[in-house]
Amino acid sequence: MKRLYLLCMVMLSSLMLSAEEFKELWIVGSAVPGGAQKLEKVSNADFKYAGELLVGELRVTTTKKIGKTTRFLTPVLPDANIVNRGLAWKETTDVTSAAWQVVIAENRYRFHVYTDRKQLYGEIFQPWGELFIGGGATASGWKEGKMQLMKQNIDNPCIWTWEGELKKHENVEEPASFKFQGQDRWYPKAIHPYSADTDILKDNRLRTGGSDTKWTLSRDGIYRITIDLFNEKVNAEIVK
């Protein structure tokens, strides 16, 4: 029994480490401006790139310069496009392993490398036409068709701002919570914090889609909120 317990603990530790073993990740290759770019470490299991890519190929690596200790996160499928809805990758030290393909030069590529599930999701980001805030902390509550419209930046269509009151409303469900939607209803487009009940004043990360986590107020007040949809960042401040 003790041996079985120890075996289970070892297996569990291995699973936990698999999502945390990469301290940093890079992309290198002909498709990468400047030849190499460091990925943003959003969490222990999520590395992200948002920016320009050229026509060519790229490799996801553990080092900026390829050497004997470099590991490659190479696609399982041959000729894998960086734009995809989730493709599996495997880890190798083989410098001749398959690369990710970029077939169109664009300024707004965005992809996530998930180290826990060993998948890469990529897209050419298209600016949204609308963005709303809704929830128990807003005056309109959780009602579809009543959410508050954010203002799109004229010079950068990926930037949205909103200023207004957020406070706890005791007479509604989840009275201090809120989130952002790409339309004046709950589906299909939405953005969420990485963790439930995140304080928007303390964490500037957000993710597109996924589980229905929400922001929760730590203080009532008049808020000014700016969202960068492309870079998946949010900045909030209390103005009064």
Per-region residue spans from a language model:
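Positively charged n-region of N-terminal signal peptides that target proteins for export
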Residues: 1-4
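Hydrophobic h-region of N-terminal signal peptides that target proteins for export
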Residues: 9-18
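Short tyrosine-centred short linear motifs in exposed loops/low-complexity segments
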Residues: 96-119, 174, 211-233
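Aromatic-rich carbohydrate-binding modules that target alpha-glucans
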Residues: 21-57, 63-88, 125-172, 183-207
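Residues within well-ordered beta-strands of beta-sheet-rich folds
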Residues: 50, 110-112, 132, 163, ...
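Eukaryotic intrinsically disordered, low-complexity regions enriched in proline/serine/threonine/glycine
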Residues: 238-240
